[in-house]
């Protein structure tokens, strides 16, 4: 039995860090494990310009503990009105991607895209620049069942998008279904996907076991076991199309434990340990380094990291709560025991 595991230092290709005091509370958790992270732009107001992204990057950098090497990779929030020349400014400022949120699909997405065709000028500029598009892949039509919105998105949005922009790099973010895993596996080399730790570890029963458990509520929502197994198969396949993206999404505990609970699981505290658990459960620890450390930078055209981190098979208990500005934050699996621990 493997007792220690050393990996090239991984990156997180999908992360929420919020802003202000909340940002200061969570950035150190990610920086301890990951060399880089793609930062989501869904603040209030959203990060829609290169200048806003640069300012946000500076605020994140200021929260990184002294002596820790961590680089935030910035994104812009795509809207119906994003001009093509903003893509040029963004690339010049070091912004690495744009994020497409269908309007109303998730947290702070009300300023998102109402019709993908309205973004075609920006997408053409991105295709020319080689800048990836990161997609929250759910339709928002209220007539479509919440558990079917990802599968419907593939036919209604992804296929036409890929047809019209065949050279555009597209990341299908936080996939949750067998349909999405199959779609990405069968697509060309310009299409990839991120997968979260919680979608690898849990199916939708986790939300309801022993009562309603809001800290397991996220968007896209957890799905049936058949879909979880398909995600595990994809993540552990060794395919370079699939890579790590936590979608760690912190919310104050009182807004999670609420009549209208916020969507999002906070996994950044123990992200790499959770992924190690999922890969260990699948008997595929040998595939974790590719998924966590290699496939993402290769797709983005960035250098692989040179440092390493080491995990040890050592049971440890996650804290139940964390400080989060003036509030508390409850990590996923808080108070529970994990089998793998990151060595300091």
From Swiss-Prot:
Any one Pfam family here would be Amidohydro_1
E.C. number(s) listed in UniProt: 3.5.2.3
Q: What class of enzyme is it?
A: hydrolase
A single Gene Ontology CC term:
cytosol
Cofactor (UniProt): Zn(2+)
Keywords, A to Z? Hydrolase, Metal-binding, Pyrimidine biosynthesis, Zinc
Catalytic activity reads:
(S)-dihydroorotate + H2O = N-carbamoyl-L-aspartate + H(+)
Q: Which residues does Zn(2+) 2 bind? A: 99, 136, 174
Q: Which SUPFAM superfamilies match?
A: Metallo-dependent hydrolases (SSF51556)
Could you tell me what the cofactor note in this record states?
Answer: Binds 2 Zn(2+) ions per subunit.
**Active site: residue positions:** 247
Q: Which residues carry this modification: N6-carboxylysine?
A: 99
Q: PANTHER family per the record?
A: DIHYDROOROTASE
Instruction: Provide the family line.
Output: Belongs to the metallo-dependent hydrolases superfamily. DHOase family. Class II DHOase subfamily.
| Role description | Catalyzes the reversible cyclization of carbamoyl aspartate to dihydroorotate.
NCBIfam families in the record: pyrC_dimer
Query: What is the designated name of this protein?
Result: Dihydroorotase
Q: Which organism is it from?
A: Leptothrix cholodnii (strain ATCC 51168 / LMG 8142 / SP-6)
Q: What is the lineage of its organism?
A: Bacteria, Pseudomonadati, Pseudomonadota, Betaproteobacteria, Burkholderiales
